Amino acid sequence: MTKVGLRIDVDTLRGTREGVPRLLATLHRHGVQASFFFSVGPDNMGRHLWRLIKPRFLWKMLRSNAASLYGWDILLAGTAWPGKNIGNANAGIIRETATYHETGLHAWDHHAWQTHSGHWSIRQLEEDIARGITALEAIIGKPVTCSAAAGWRADGRVVRAKEPFNLRYNSDCRGTTLFRPLLMPGQTGTPQIPVTLPTWDEVIGPAVQAQSFNTWIISRMLQDKGTPVYTIHAEVEGIVHQPLFEDLLVRARDAGITFCPLGELLPASPESLPLGQIVRGHIPGREGWLGCQQAASAS
């Protein structure tokens, strides 16, 4: 049996309102639990449109057929009008999710984090994280114990900024296996659970066709030599590609794969995890930098 952590990112108002309820129903039908990470502040995702001037981002949007994949309401959110508050508008859906699944913070403002966090000060990072955690805790009525950086935009500064919040784990980077981030010699931070597998929008195109994606990703899960963690998005697998995701759950079960919340991947003693660090890097299929796992020594 292969255990795979299932991470569900919720970036937008529509993803929360339409995608999450469908995912909850789908997961319930198949007896699967996952980790949901919510954006709870304003939905300004449409402001990413300026990135179309960047060739890699434009190619990604064309390759994934973004207009039909996400819908124009997502692609234009927060452009000509102020972005609506996601958490306030969908508190009931978020509370229901937290009743049945592990629930953590993705971002206060997904667009702001993905666009600006790379040059924010530690204080600005802490204030933004605090704003998101406070809002999410007010919605679900219990402490937030985990987080996942929006767009995997994380580095050593983000690791340090999250330390005051005493989270059980963070999932802020791409990598191969769980690790303890080294803050300074002799001091480690909150365990990191990296995403190890590509997302739909990173690979769909000439190399992998939509109709063969499930076969391809299951093969990758079975071949993963680390701790497999897979990310889906409420805006994609919860809406237009919900049937494809349901088919994935069936095929994965038949292949001996069990999906679980990320928290279930943590060992009883996190001190046993190897040391590592998060550095800025790049991966195929994704525009811009993102946090990547790198080995570190204790000295």
From Swiss-Prot:
Keyword Transmembrane: no
Family matches, as InterPro entries: ArnD (IPR023557), Glyco_hydro/deAcase_b/a-brl (IPR011330), NODB_dom (IPR002509), Polysacc_deacetylase_ArnD (IPR050248)
Pfam family, one: Polysacc_deac_1
Gene Ontology cellular component annotations, sorted alphabetically: membrane
Reaction catalysed by this enzyme: 4-deoxy-4-formamido-alpha-L-arabinopyranosyl di-trans,octa-cis-undecaprenyl phosphate + H2O = 4-amino-4-deoxy-alpha-L-arabinopyranosyl di-trans,octa-cis-undecaprenyl phosphate + formate
Gene Ontology biological process terms, A to Z: 4-amino-4-deoxy-alpha-L-arabinopyranosyl undecaprenyl phosphate biosynthetic process; lipid A biosynthetic process; lipopolysaccharide biosynthetic process; response to antibiotic
Iron-sulfur found in the keyword field: no
Pathway annotation: Glycolipid biosynthesis; 4-amino-4-deoxy-alpha-L-arabinose undecaprenyl phosphate biosynthesis; 4-amino-4-deoxy-alpha-L-arabinose undecaprenyl phosphate from UDP-4-deoxy-4-formamido-beta-L-arabinose and undecaprenyl phosphate: step 2/2; Bacterial outer membrane biogenesis; lipopolysaccharide biosynthesis
GO MF entries: hydrolase activity, acting on carbon-nitrogen (but not peptide) bonds, in linear amides
This protein's UniProt keywords: Antibiotic resistance, Hydrolase, Lipid A biosynthesis, Lipid biosynthesis, Lipid metabolism, Lipopolysaccharide biosynthesis
Superkingdom of origin organism: Bacteria
Domain NodB homology: 2-260
EC number assigned by the record: 3.5.1.n3
Role of this protein: Catalyzes the deformylation of 4-deoxy-4-formamido-L-arabinose-phosphoundecaprenol to 4-amino-4-deoxy-L-arabinose-phosphoundecaprenol. The modified arabinose is attached to lipid A and is required for resistance to polymyxin and cationic antimicrobial peptides.
Homology family: Belongs to the polysaccharide deacetylase family. ArnD deformylase subfamily.
PANTHER family on file: 4-DEOXY-4-FORMAMIDO-L-ARABINOSE-PHOSPHOUNDECAPRENOL DEFORMYLASE ARND-RELATED (PTHR10587:SF137), GLYCOSYL TRANSFERASE-RELATED (PTHR10587)
Protein name (database record): Probable 4-deoxy-4-formamido-L-arabinose-phosphoundecaprenol deformylase ArnD
Organism, as annotated: Salmonella paratyphi B (strain ATCC BAA-1250 / SPB7)
